[in-house]
Amino acid sequence: MALVQRIPISSSSIRNWQQARTNLTPICCLHYNTASSSSSPFTEKHSVERYQRDQWLYKAVEPTPPSTPSPSPFEDEVFVRENDIASQLPELKKLLAVLKEKRVKGCKGGDCGPGDVYLVGTGPGDPELLTLKAVRVIQSADLLLYDRLVSNDVLELVAPDARLLYVGKTAGYHSRTQEEIHELLLNFAEAGATVVRLKGGDPLVFGRGGEEMDFLQQQGIRVQVIPGITAASGIAAELGIPLTHRGVATSVRFLTGHSRKGGTDPLFVAENAADPDTTLVVYMGLGTLPSLAQKLMDHGLPSDTPAVAVERGTTPLQRTVFAELKDFATEIQSAGLVSPTLIIIGKVVELSPLWPHCTKESSCLVETR
């Protein structure tokens, strides 16, 4: 049985970004209730709330009375599927027409270039980890396309007259294909809009930002990347884990648990990944962790290597499981961690001030916020 520890960490430094904003008429409406919205972007319920929030309505709409029941958790997935953002296409076309007309009127001599596209990393979850440049760009955007891992706290920074469009993906459900996202970015940039593509973490670390940048540059669109704090850095700092440390770890390696080829076997694990002097950080690795852990031990990584899994890192819902590699997969399953979860494997994990709370005989589930 896992040893459960509750370690209090002061939340006084966490700014309250969730003040009610009733003036966001271009963004809100339908059944969205800003007063009751949680900051967690990771459940289907919040996917529904985001869908409702992001309806682009160009006419006055009375909000649904608070007494109106929202879909039950069991209905959420069906609700999201039946209300796919394809229903927003008519409004997208309207917005494109408005932007194109505005662009033509504002042009001098009929020579107008396309708008700019920014790929913006929003960090691992805590809005205070945003860069100043990211905040400035977010607040100046005409249109923002955002992913599942972008927190509601970050979305509260969007200007009142900006337009939001959710293009996130979950296992088994993609609100938009990658190709459709490319076309949306291109069409609005060609219409002269300032377009921001919001991504969790860093856009160029397992975020497919390179694909979007390459596509747009081939179409003659200028793309600027605003880096974000990737989950590995943000979460390691949160737990006091140095990813490299003199005499302990001389390198760090980022891996992905999702292979484009599919399947459950982590094909990305090579023999040199089992180097005891290397820190391994695995993104999206919950499904392949049992195979990964076994393969690492088969290649010589000691079975007592410290490891940690962090669910929803740097957010108020963060949960953390510490364990030795031989018990890691079992303890994660026992704790019921869900995506998004980051995994760190290596001797540096033992340097975390939270690690001494765990005994050699037991794993440790820590709720740190």
From Swiss-Prot:
To which pathway does this protein belong?
Answer: Porphyrin-containing compound metabolism; siroheme biosynthesis; precorrin-2 from uroporphyrinogen III: step 1/1
Sample GO molecular function, one term: uroporphyrin-III C-methyltransferase activity
Return the Gene3D superfamilies for the record.
Cobalt-precorrin-4 Transmethylase, Domain 1, Methyltransferase, Cobalt-precorrin-4 Transmethylase, Domain 2
EC number of the protein = 2.1.1.107
What top-level class of enzyme does the UniProt entry assign?
A: transferase
**Residues that hold S-adenosyl-L-homocysteine according to the record:** 124, 200-202, 230-231, 284, 341
User: What is the scientific name of the source organism?
Assistant: Arabidopsis thaliana (Mouse-ear cress)
SUPFAM superfamilies noted in UniProt: Tetrapyrrole methylase
Q: Name one Pfam family in it.
A: TP_methylase
Main location as per UniProt: plastid
Lineage from the top down? Answer: Eukaryota, Viridiplantae, Streptophyta, Embryophyta, Tracheophyta
Q: Phenotype on deletion?
A: Embryo lethal.
GO terms (BP aspect): methylation; positive regulation of chlorophyll biosynthetic process; regulation of nitrate assimilation; regulation of sulfate assimilation; response to light stimulus; siroheme biosynthetic process
According to the record, the signal peptide region is: none
Q: What is this protein called?
A: S-adenosyl-L-methionine-dependent uroporphyrinogen III methyltransferase, chloroplastic
Q: Which domain of life is it from?
A: Eukaryota
Reactions it catalyzes: uroporphyrinogen III + 2 S-adenosyl-L-methionine = precorrin-2 + 2 S-adenosyl-L-homocysteine + H(+)
